[in-house]
Amino acid sequence: MKSILWHNLKLCAHGDPNDTIADAAIAVNGDGTIAWTGRASDVPAGYVHWPREDLRGAWVTPGLVDCHTHLVYGGQRADEFAQRLAGASYEEIAQRGGGIVSTVRATRDASEAALFEQACARLRPLLAEGVTAIEIKSGYGLELASERRMLRVARQLGERFPVSVYTTFLGAHALPPEYAGRADEYIDEVCERMLPALADEGLVDAVDVFCERIGFTLAQSERVFEAAARRGLPVKMHAEQLSNGGGSALAARYRALSADHLEYLDAAGVAAMRASGTTAVLLPGAYYFIRETKLPPIDLLRRHGVPIALATDHNPGTSPLTSLLLTMNMGCTVFKLTVQEALLGVTRHAAAALGASDRHGSLAPGRQADFAVWSVSTLAELAYWFGRPLCERVVKGGVTVFTRDAR
């Protein structure tokens, strides 16, 4: 591609709506990285005569980052939604053989091609909202061949679509039926067979575990983290969603990229996360969908300076959500985040939760030229509207990959 000077735009370069430039320009190198950003009046002489692209005064932010999703799976779980409306809890449904395990059955039965086609339909609406980087977890196969299929599909999505895909191995998501009553043996399988094989195939960017009463214990979770450490892989954790089990402190001890959910996080866990630099990933879609009543400790996270990210947590059972903008709205209305916190939560802090701050989440020299162009008059509208298309253009690596009128 050729170098381009994007001009006549309002710039929020670092995901902070309190740090903007009213008349800005972005110089993009031919390799798709940022060369320079700043005031239009300050464009360096070396970029002044580059070919130009006029954005007609639109707002520009970094491309959005969805840092926690379960996008690849078979089937759906609308029947469980009806059960939940009738009064069944998430734990009760899981104990009846529903929940994650029901999706495991559908995923194991699906071909790789079928998994890919279903995931495409879930990914497209996110891309149309300005998402340029996404995390995709495994965890609905729970045996080597099916976990491999899920991670292969995630890689294929990154090859087929203009989005950076970060894969996470979540073999320790639930106990598969064939291991009922033998959780430690299943963790042996995860640590000694599944993770080494998948890592050797280049399918794993990070490792996650569901540490909860209906998931895995602290001791079992630590075994998974140790296996990841032996492979030099970063870790993250589903922690404190349904109870305070101390998972966040364990995650912090292993310097996890993120601890996610966190409704039952306590002060000790917050302090540990702050000390380790672990990002708090909040998932308001799941909170809303399962009608949780315990809010994450937002004020504690603020006081300790723990970075807060937001993500869709797209999954079939507790958050069938394919809108990161609606996630921002929920973060503000349900979790009482500010617009500043919400936008940082889907840009800079979300990139940190992926260990990808050097590539995503901010428009600065050397980073990928991934940005979204918005048809709004103020950035608060990104968290204000829901159900309304706001993204008019997506640029990935300096190339326009989506325009609203091209859909």
From Swiss-Prot:
By sequence similarity, the record places it as follows:
Belongs to the metallo-dependent hydrolases superfamily. HutI family.
A GO cellular-component term linked to this record: cytoplasm
- The positions annotated for binding Fe(3+) are 68, 70, 238, 313
Q: How is the cofactor bound, as the UniProt entry phrases it?
A: Binds 1 zinc or iron ion per subunit.
Query: Which EC numbers does the record give?
Result: 3.5.2.7
Instruction: Give the matching PANTHER family.
Output: IMIDAZOLONEPROPIONASE (PTHR42752), IMIDAZOLONEPROPIONASE-RELATED (PTHR42752:SF1)
The coenzyme or cofactor needed here is: Zn(2+); Fe(3+)
Question: What SUPFAM superfamilies does the record point to?
Answer: Composite domain of metallo-dependent hydrolases, Metallo-dependent hydrolases
* Binding site residues for 4-imidazolone-5-propanoate: 77, 140, 173, 241, 318
Q: Where in the cell is it found?
A: Cytoplasm
The residues the record assigns to binding N-formimidoyl-L-glutamate are 140, 315, 317
Q: Kind of enzyme, top EC level? A: hydrolase
Q: Where are the transmembrane segments?
A: none
Q: Which UniProt keywords apply?
A: Cytoplasm, Histidine metabolism, Hydrolase, Iron, Metal-binding, Zinc
Return the protein name. Answer: Imidazolonepropionase
Q: Which GO terms describe its molecular function?
A: imidazolonepropionase activity; iron ion binding; zinc ion binding
Alphabetical list of Pfam families matching this protein: Amidohydro_1
Domain of life from the UniProt record: Bacteria
**Biological role stated in the UniProt entry:** Catalyzes the hydrolytic cleavage of the carbon-nitrogen bond in imidazolone-5-propanoate to yield N-formimidoyl-L-glutamate. It is the third step in the universal histidine degradation pathway.
Main subcellular localisation: cytoplasm
Q: Which residues bind Zn(2+)?
A: 68, 70, 238, 313
Pathway entry: Amino-acid degradation; L-histidine degradation into L-glutamate; N-formimidoyl-L-glutamate from L-histidine: step 3/3
Tell me which Gene Ontology terms the entry assigns under biological process: L-histidine catabolic process to glutamate and formamide; L-histidine catabolic process to glutamate and formate
What this protein catalyses is: 4-imidazolone-5-propanoate + H2O = N-formimidoyl-L-glutamate
